[in-house]
UniProtKB/Swiss-Prot annotation:
The protein's name: tRNA (cytidine(56)-2'-O)-methyltransferase
GO terms under cellular component: cytoplasm
Lineage: Archaea, Thermoproteota, Thermoprotei, Sulfolobales, Sulfolobaceae
Organism this protein belongs to: Metallosphaera sedula (strain ATCC 51363 / DSM 5348 / JCM 9185 / NBRC 15509 / TH2)
SUPFAM superfamilies: alpha/beta knot
Job description of the protein: Specifically catalyzes the AdoMet-dependent 2'-O-ribose methylation of cytidine at position 56 in tRNAs.
Gene Ontology terms for molecular function: tRNA (cytidine(56)-2'-O)-methyltransferase activity
Length: 174
């Protein structure tokens, strides 16, 4: 996935949440437009403890090149925007795609991205959070299976409970 226009001082919390949702809901990695090594370290720390070493985080300076290269290798680009076609109307087509680059913006997104996207997809045509958009999009594309992801390389795990909280170290100790 691609996070466009990350502004370290203004967007650090939301971009962190976008990356966490991407990882937890099955994305293979995130490209962040900009340079924020503190954010990259935060996500790498989460991966180190909670698992998912396959998840890559990469800071990039030229997102248009990434989009062009992605499309040149047969990938499809999905731009999440409130101005797009509502997800229920395109979700079956999206489930058939193999290589998807999902774009979410931090600041106003240039028209170029709307034109280059294979799909401009709305999660309702109302303003709301890009974190919510990404979560709902991944849930629909992965048909809910992302909720069953087990990170075999995690150092700790949550044991689901009706009441209370239980976290275990994966070396067998509590």
């Amino acid at each position: 996935m691609l996070r466009l226009g990350h502004r370290p001082q203004r967007d650090k919390r939301v971009t962190t949440h976008v990356a966490l949702v991407a990882r937890a809901f099955g994305a293979k990695g995130i490209y962040i437009h900009g340079n924020d090594q503190k954010l990259a370290k935060k996500i790498e720390d989460v991966i180190n403890v909670w698992g998912g070493k396959y998840f890559r985080i990469e800071m990039i300076s030229n997102p248009k090149k990434l989009v062009n290269d992605w499309k040149a290798t047969g990938g499809k680009v999905v731009h999440l925007t409130m101005y797009g076609i509502n997800l229920p109307h395109v979700q079956e087509k999206l489930k058939e795609l193999d290589k998807i680059l999902v774009i979410v913006g931090a600041e106003k997104v240039e028209g170029w991205y709307y034109h280059m996207a294979d799909f401009n997809v709305a999660i309702s045509n109302q303003p709301h959070s890009e974190v919510a958009s990404l979560a709902l999009f991944l849930d629909r594309v992965y048909k809910g299976e992302e909720l069953n992801i087990m990170f075999g390389d995690s150092k700790i795990s949550v044991i689901p409970m009706e009441r209370g909280k239980k976290v275990v170290r994966n070396d067998g100790q509590h």
